[in-house]
A protein has these predicted regions:
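C-terminal (or distal) subdomains of carbohydrate-active enzymes
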Residues: 1-112
């Protein structure tokens, strides 16, 4: 699921990590800048408006680009939005290569 709103200051995106509001741009060099586990979700506290995208069923979010195994030290391009990983079997081990059941992933979008 990708959420790419037009924002005046996309560098203001924040993620809820262990109950703390963290910028995706504050990840140290050689840290994982591409994929994060979030608690409540992500938010944008901009002058042009406030929004929160709360995830109720999935925790993994890729800021900037949909990239699962692209590990590099470049900062994410936050104007490209937030992308939530709903299902994956990149590794092809210990899991079937398909999903036989129905799935439901809920999100809550708040504006202010």
């Amino acid at each position: 699921f990708s959420f790419v709103p037009r924002l005046r200051s996309p560098k203001l995106w924040r993620m809820d990590k262990l109950g703390q509001s963290v910028s995706p741009l504050e990840v140290i060099r050689n840290g994982n800048r591409k994929l994060h586990a979030v608690g409540q979700g992500v938010s944008y506290p901009g002058e042009d408006g406030w929004l929160a995208l709360n995830t109720l069923d999935t925790a993994l979010v890729a800021p900037g680009e949909r990239c699962l195994v692209n590990f590099n030290n470049r900062q994410p391009k936050l104007a490209k939005g937030m992308h939530f990983l709903l299902y994956d079997n990149t590794w092809c081990t210990n899991f079937p290569m398909w999903y036989e059941d129905d799935a439901c992933f809920r999100f809550e979008i708040l504006f202010g």
